[in-house]
Design a protein with these regions (language model features):
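A short, conserved alpha-helix within the catalytic core of class I
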Residues: 133-142
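A conserved beta-strand element that flanks and buttresses the S-adenosyl-L-methionine
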Residues: 125
């Protein structure tokens, strides 16, 4: 079953964020997690191989924006970098409230319209977010805009090497209604090569929950 983005958002608002205790997904009754349980269930360990490898890119910088932060696992992962100031960004107010209650600096906002000025953060990081977006162009452009030196994007669905992106992958084997896209490296590269704020970009393999890292160096 493929799902349009508007139907995906409607499903989530009517189920996870409605206070229901259970929901039906492809004919199965599934227990509805609380907002906190849901947020934590998608965090994974801060010691995941892919997280550790990506995190090595943070250490020389002083500020980071975590786009689509969820429960903000990277806040805990960067504690050894004493000079690095963390800010989380998530579109779900309930999740942001949970983070704030834990003392984590976090704001409500969309990756399509990041509520910060140009070059506000040394590093902008996003993990497992782009695949859920209706299009990759605007969120990537926004991350580049607010970054001063570096943008790091981790993909859990490995991008295609060439060809056109695939929209709305099948989600029948998931417990939730999920909106997934598989994007194309060649299409993303074309976008980056025409952006005068991009100095260079590189794809590399990751092990763990993430499959591919896109590293974008900024020139401003």
């Amino acid at each position: 079953m493929n799902m349009e983005r508007k139907n995906f958002e409607k499903w989530w608002s009517e189920n996870l964020f409605s206070g229901k205790t259970e929901y039906e997904h492809h004919g199965k009754k599934i227990q509805m997690p609380s907002i906190e349980e849901f947020s934590n269930s998608w965090m994974g360990s801060i010691l995941e191989k892919d997280r550790v490898k990506v995190r090595k890119n943070f250490k020389r910088y002083k500020s980071i924006l975590d786009v689509g932060c969820g429960g903000s696992p990277e806040f805990y992962g960067i504690q050894k970098f004493k000079k690095l100031k963390y800010t989380g960004l998530d579109i779900t107010p309930e999740i942001v409230e949970l983070n704030l209650a834990k003392g984590i600096n976090c704001v409500v906002g969309s990756a399509n319209q990041i509520p910060f000025e140009d070059s506000s953060f040394d590093v902008v990081h996003s993990r497992h977010v782009i695949e859920h977006m209706e299009d990759y162009k605007k969120p990537i452009e926004e991350m580049i805009r607010v970054a001063k030196f570096l943008v790091l994007i981790s993909f859990f669905i490995e991008p295609l090497e060439t060809g056109e992106s695939i929209k709305s992958l099948d989600n029948e084997n998931t417990e939730y209604e999920i909106y997934h896209n598989q994007y194309s490296k060649s299409e993303i590269s074309q976008l980056l090569e025409t952006n005068n704020q991009v100095k260079s970009h590189k794809y590399s393999k990751l092990e763990g929950q993430s499959k591919t890292l896109l590293k974008i160096k900024i020139s401003k």
